[in-house]
């Protein structure tokens, strides 16, 4: 035909062979006549997919979402010295609050990620913050954390406070592109427990008050370790 300068449309995709980069394979005009391939079936075309053989959402360019969760949270430190969760020798309710994060995926670089309490930014993870596969990071409200904490990464809130409200709060973690990665609603757990809430069993379970779990042997919290005090890995 005249439109195709005398060239046929061999693959019948509506694009004449002289303009079709894949003349024997039906394709899309936006892709110069070549097929729009999505090898992993995640809805992100291979040409735009940073992980073409691993399904993942568009917001992460086709790569899997970060696999991180909150395993334990202390928003109501116990009274007096038993509430010294960060181990610095003093009980200060804002400083002894903590959030324990567990990474159940591969090594995860969270440099530049941020933690918000409701709308307030409370912490930005500094450059070089990488949680290893199966690793833990404990974020305290402040103070001078003293102890091994199961070999976990330990940081204090860059804004000097977490300020988790005993009557309920909403914690959100954003990645370096300001995409929400993790949300946690404290409100269902808001009963002024004077101890932490932790998953039981660790990682996979629902949240329960720490001291009531048999393996805790009465301990009120376990930042950086499993509920029985053992290391995660």
Tell where the protein language model's regions lie, with residue ranges:
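Extracellular calcium-associated, cysteine-rich motifs in secreted modular proteins
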Residues: 1-67
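Acidic, Ser/Thr/Gly/Pro-rich low-complexity segments and short DxT(G/T)-type signature motifs
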Residues: 59, 212-213
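Activation on beta-sandwich/Ig-like modules and their edge loops
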Residues: 65-209, 226-233
């Amino acid at each position: 035909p005249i439109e195709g300068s005398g060239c046929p449309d061999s693959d019948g995709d509506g694009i004449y062979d002289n303009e079709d980069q894949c003349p024997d394979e039906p394709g899309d005009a936006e892709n110069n006549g070549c097929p729009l391939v999505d090898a992993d079936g995640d809805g992100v075309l291979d040409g735009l997919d940073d992980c073409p053989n691993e399904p993942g959402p568009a917001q992460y360019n086709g790569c899997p979402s970060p696999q991180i969760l909150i395993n334990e949270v202390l928003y109501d430190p116990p009274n007096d010295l038993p509430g010294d969760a960060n181990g610095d020798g003093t009980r200060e309710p804002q400083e002894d609050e903590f959030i324990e994060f567990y990474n159940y995926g591969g090594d995860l670089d969270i440099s530049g990620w941020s933690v918000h309490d409701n709308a307030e930014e409370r912490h930005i993870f500094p450059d070089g913050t990488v949680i290893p596969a199966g690793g833990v990071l404990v974020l305290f409200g402040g103070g001078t954390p003293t102890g091994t904490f199961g070999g976990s990464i330990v940081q204090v809130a860059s804004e000097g406070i977490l300020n988790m409200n005993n009557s309920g709060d909403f914690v959100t973690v954003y990645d370096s592109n300001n995409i929400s990665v993790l949300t946690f609603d404290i409100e269902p757990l808001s009963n002024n427990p004077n101890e932490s809430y932790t998953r039981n069993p660790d990682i996979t379970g629902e949240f329960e008050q720490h001291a009531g779990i048999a393996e805790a042997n009465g301990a009120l919290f376990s930042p950086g370790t499993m509920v029985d005090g053992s290391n995660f890995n």
